[in-house]
């Protein structure tokens, strides 16, 4: 085998493997790094001869589409909802998290006031000469507590494009994975390729804690999916004119691109930050106050109660630096909000109270089959308790309800005599199929008998 490898050579220039830095194998052929560089030079020369061919084609199609679409006007001070109005809208969709909703309401209101502000730094008075800087938002809280939902609800109320990105898929430019500019492409697509509209949108970057570097100290090796991504995001978060490939993928110096100014885009970053409590605990020299219960560690009830409220006061930027975020990144996220873990009572409210609550969703689904669905209070409580045990927050609720409703939703559409159905605690506890039978005409609800 070693003798065979010694005779490997480039299929294009004929140089042996030991004469080049890299030899890449294909189906029966090999190409060296020098030939790859030569191919790139040839392609670059051809693009230089006609660099605007593809660019102009895309620009013309984009302008043609924009001409047929009514552009949304930029926000005015009068049209921006006040913080109290924003929080009221959030209350209709998100249960609990009062401090976080208040922080978000003020931050979003100030951000869109900034967009409506005419001051450009050239005015004659102190106020008109003031340039307002952008304040991005960092959300910290356990999984399933409503971080993404809060961002989605804000975008819905403000009627602006909204895009979600997963930080774990991002890598530093030049490495396998997504470039940070692809985040802007998603926002642009949500805005139907309207650049002006996209520049007023909201981007939510989830799992931001997963790009923390492994230690507080800078690494001597390249961390392309951790610190490298943080560095790549800095200019975008602060505000820059980014060149976005309209078809996604990697940027090319002579390829087609769309310019987007990120200075008016609101970035909201969220993450669970598992283990951040240990960092705070170490600094304070007190018992742990973290999000995740540890069976090997004794925690008092007062410790657990402090998680939501007191961590807001206890957490400092230096804790995030020790966790693995670089200081420059933290500096570009000046507004932070801590979201509390959801207890069983909050999960009960999530099932029934919000506008798009799960119970309302399933009632709507069955109403299409002319069946009125209801849930006993103890059934709702049992569902919430089971979701709380699974430790995945509100995300567990849908899975549990789907399990309970599977056989019901399978059989009810074919049974035209059934007009009402009630979900009981027994059904939740058993979470089994069972036979659906109609009640007599003088009974109001349908009961479920175990098979």
UniProtKB/Swiss-Prot annotation:
The gene from which this protein is expressed is: clpX
Q: What is this protein called?
A: ATP-dependent Clp protease ATP-binding subunit ClpX
For this chain, the family text in UniProt reads: Belongs to the ClpX chaperone family.
> Can you give the residue ranges of the ClpX-type ZB domain?
1-51
Per its UniProt record, what SMART domains does this chain match? Answer: AAA (SM00382), ClpB_D2-small (SM01086), zf-C4_ClpX (SM00994)
Q: Which GO terms describe its biological process?
A: cell division; proteolysis involved in protein catabolic process
Task: Kindly list the positions annotated as binding Zn(2+).
Answer: 10, 13, 32, 35
Sorted keywords for this record are: ATP-binding, Chaperone, Metal-binding, Nucleotide-binding, Zinc
For this UniProt entry, the molecular function terms from Gene Ontology, in alphabetical order, are: ATP binding; ATP hydrolysis activity; ATP-dependent protein folding chaperone; protein dimerization activity; unfolded protein binding; zinc ion binding
């Amino acid at each position: 085998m070693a003798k065979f490898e010694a005779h490997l050579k480039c299929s294009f220039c004929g140089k042996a493997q030991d004469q080049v830095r890299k030899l890449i194998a294909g189906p029966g052929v090999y190409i060296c790094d020098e030939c790859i560089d030569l191919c790139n030079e040839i392609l670059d020369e051809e693009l230089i001869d006609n660099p605007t061919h593809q660019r102009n084609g895309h620009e013309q199609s984009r302008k043609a589409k924009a001409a047929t679409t009514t552009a949304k006007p930029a926000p005015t001070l009068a049209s921006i909802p006040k913080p109290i109005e924003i929080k009221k809208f959030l209350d209709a969709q998100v249960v609990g998290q009062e401090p976080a909703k208040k922080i978000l309401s003020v931050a979003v209101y100030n951000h869109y006031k900034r967009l409506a502000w005419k001051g450009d730094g050239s005015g004659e008075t102190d106020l008109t000469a003031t340039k307002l800087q952008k304040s991005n938002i960092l959300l910290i809280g356990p999984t399933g507590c409503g971080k993404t939902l809060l961002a989605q609800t804000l975008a819905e109320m403000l009627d602006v494009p909204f895009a979600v990105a997963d930080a774990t898929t991002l890598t530093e430019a030049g490495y396998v994975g997504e470039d940070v500019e692809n985040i802007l492409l998603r926002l642009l697509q949500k805005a139907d390729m309207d650049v002006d509209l996209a520049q007023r949108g909201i981007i939510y970057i989830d799992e931001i804690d997963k790009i923390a570097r492994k230690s507080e100290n800078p690494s001597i090796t390249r961390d392309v999916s951790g610190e490298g991504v943080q560095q790549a995001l800095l200019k975008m978060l602060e505000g820059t004119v980014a060149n976005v490939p309209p078809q996604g993928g990697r940027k090319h110096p002579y390829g087609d691109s769309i310019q987007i100014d990120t200075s008016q885009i609101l970035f909201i970053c969220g993450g669970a930050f598992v283990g951040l409590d240990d960092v705070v605990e170490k600094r304070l020299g007190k018992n742990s106050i973290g999000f995740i219960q540890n069976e090997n560690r004794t925690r008092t009830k007062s410790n657990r109660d402090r998680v939501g409220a007191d961590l807001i006061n206890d957490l400092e930027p230096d804790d995030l630096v020790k966790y693995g975020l670089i200081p420059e990144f933290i500096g570009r996220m000046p507004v932070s909000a801590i979201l509390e873990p959801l207890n069983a009572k909050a999960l009960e409210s999530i099932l029934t109270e919000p506008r798009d609550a799960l119970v309302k969703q399933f009632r709507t689904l069955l109403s299409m089959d002319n069946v009125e669905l209801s849930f006993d209070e103890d059934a709702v409580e049992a569902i919430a308790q089971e979701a709380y045990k699974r430790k995945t927050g509100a995300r567990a609720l849908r899975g549990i309800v789907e399990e309970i409703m599977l056989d019901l939703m399978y059989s009810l559409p074919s049974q035209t005599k059934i007009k009402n159905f009630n979900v009981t605690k027994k059904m939740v506890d058993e979470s089994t199929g069972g036979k659906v039978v109609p009640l007599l005409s003088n009974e109001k609800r349908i009961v479920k008998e175990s098979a």
